[in-house]
C-alpha cells in the first residue's frame, strides 16, 4: 500500500510504496505452496505473451541445438569452399561469386592439367562432404521442428495463429482470475466456515474431466489422419444422426451427440453450478476454493475445444447456421465465465450492460422501431457467432492480447524498479512549493502514472493514497481532495503517448496509424490538464492556501540528478516516433527499465524480473476480462446491426441540428461508459456511436476522439463515476459529492471535444500557424471557463 512517510529522511522523500500493488477486497492472499503456484502461473502467463509477441518460435527453441550444429557445419562448408579456391591457384583466385557448381566445374577443368590434381580432388571431396553434412543437419533441424509442430499440432509455434493466440489469452486469464479472485469480498465480518459445498464442488470435477476427455478424443481424431480433408484443410462435421451429408462421411458419426452430451452439457452444468456455489461458499482467504478451481478448469476446457475445432475448416462456418453445436456450447460457457470474472474484478456495471445486450439479441424481433430485427436469432446462431473475431475475439481482445498486456508488463517493470516513487517525488520537488502544492503534484503524478496504468479508478488507488491525505493536510476539503485526484487520474487516460491503452484500441478499430493518433492527442490533453491546474490554483487562491515548505519536500537537485529514470519512457516515445512497431518499442522500453534499475538501489536481478512478470500477470486480469466482456457487446452489435440503425437516428437528428446530434452522441457515449473501465467504455461506444458520426461526414479521427473523450469522462460523471467513488473511499467524503466536484474540476474536458470538432487544428491538422493559433485561443478559452466556474 501507499504510505505517507512520517519520518522524513535526509532527502525528504515523500512517496514510498506508490509502486506497490493495491490489494482488491476479494483477492486471495496465498502463502507457501499456494503462493508459489499462483506466482509461477502469473509469471509464466505474462512471460509467454512477451515471448509470443516478439515472435520467438517454440519449435525453433526445441531444435536450437541441432540448428547450432547445422550452422557450424554450414560454416565448415564455407571454409571448404575457400580451401578449394586456394587449391586451384590463380584460377581459383580469379573465381568470382559463391556458386559451388561453377567452382566444381572449374576444378574439373583445372585437374586435367594441374600438377596437384590429387590435392584438388581431395578438396572437392572435402567440400562435398561438408555440404552433405550441413544439408543433413539442416534437414534434421527441420525435422525436429516439424515433429514438435505435429506433436503440438494445436499449438505449433510462436507467434501463434491469431485466433488460437487470442483464445489461449482469454483462457489463461480466466484460469488465473478465478484462482485469484473470490466471488465475494473478504470484509471485516468475513468468517471462513466448513461447508459441504466444497464436497459438491469437488464432485463437479467429474463433468469437467468428462468434457476435457471428450475434447481430447476430438483432438486425437483430427490428428490421426482419419479426418476428411477439403481443399487441403481438415474438416469438422457435427451433424445429427440421419443427416444426408453425414452418410458421405461415416467417420463423423456420433460427433454431434458427443458434442452435446459428453462435452456441452457437462461443461455447462459444471460452469453454472460452480458460479452458484462460489457465491455462497466461504473459504479462507489463503486457500483455493474448489468451486473456483472448477471454473478455472472450465475456462481451460473452453479454450482447448475452441483451439481444436477452429484449427479446422469449421472456422468458416462461424456466424452461420452451420456452426458446430459444440462451438455454441463452448461459447455459452466461455461468455458466462467472462461475465462472472468481470463481475469479480470490475463490478456489476459492465455485466449488467452486457446482460441487457444479450436480452436484446433474443428479443429484438419483438421490439418496435429501430431496435427491431426481421428474424429471431437462435441460441446456436448467436453463440456460434459471438466467440469469433466479430465478437469476443475481435478488436478488444486483439488489443488486450498485444498492446495492452505488453504495456502492463512495461508498467510492472517500472513498478519493480520503483520508478513510480521517483515520478511522484519528482512532481513534489517541482510543484510542491506552489500554493495548494499537493493538488498540483497530484495532477502531474497521477497524469504520468495514469497514462501507463490503464484504469482511472486503479490509478486513484495507487497515487491517491499518498496525494489525497496531503491535500487534506494543507487545507483542501476532503471532497475537493478526492475530486482533484479523480480528475487527474482520469486525465492520464487521454495523455499521449500511451493514453491508458486507448490509443492502441483506436488504432485497431480505425486503422489509423498509432503515431498519428498520439500526435493528435497532444493539444486536447494539454487543454485538459491546463484546465484542471487552473481550477486547482483558483481554489487554492480562494482559500488562501500555502504550498509545502522546502524542508517538507524532496530536494529538486537530487531529483534532477536521477532524471535517467525517465529513460524507459523516453526510449518508448522515441522508438514509436522513429516508426518502430508498438511491440518492438514496448519491448525495448521494458528492457530499458530493467537496465536503468541497475543505476539505483533497486536493481532488477532474475528474482525481481520474475516478480515483475508475476505482477504483470495479476495486473492484466481485469483489463483482459473487461475487454472480452466488451467483445460480447461488440458481437451483439455486429450481428444485429443496431449500430447502423443508431447511425440512422444520428443522421435524422443532424438534419435538424448537427450540434443536437453531437450532444446526443455525447450522452450515449457517457451512458455506455458509466461504471466501465476506459478500454471497455470506448470499445462499446466506438461500436455504437462512432459509425453514426462518421456517416455525418465527420472525419474518422475526429469522430473517434469525440467518442473516446466522453467514454473516458464517464469515470468522473455522476451518478456512476468509478474514479470519483474510488477517491471518495480514500478521502472519506460523500461519493456523490465527490463525483459532482470532480465533474466540475474536469468541466473543460466536456467542451474540448466540441472545440476540436469545429476546429480540426486542435488535432494537429492544418498548417503550423493554424495549429498554434487554435491552441493559443483554446487555452485562453479554457482559462476563462475555469475562472467562471470557480
Where are the regions a protein language model picked out?
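Hydrophobic mid-bilayer segments of alpha-helices in multi-pass membrane transport proteins
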Residues: 36-43, 166-178, 198-208, 259-275, ...
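Low-complexity, proline/glycine-enriched hydrophobic segments characteristic of transmembrane helices
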Residues: 54-162, 209, 221-254, 765
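Transmembrane alpha-helix interface/packing and boundary motifs in multi-pass membrane proteins
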Residues: 411-415, 446-455, 487-493, 576, ...
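Membrane-interfacial loop-to-helix junctions in multi-pass transporters
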Residues: 323-329, 390-403, 430-442, 474-480, ...
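Transmembrane alpha-helix boundary signature
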Residues: 184-188, 217-227, 277-285, 304-320, ...
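Core transmembrane alpha-helical segments of multi-pass membrane transporters/permeases
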Residues: 97, 136, 340, 344-345, ...
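Long, contiguous bundles of hydrophobic transmembrane helices that form the permeation core
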Residues: 2-42, 61-65, 192-196, 201, ...
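Hydrophobic transmembrane alpha-helices that form the pore/transport pathway of multi-pass ion
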Residues: 424-492, 498-505, 511, 678-710, ...
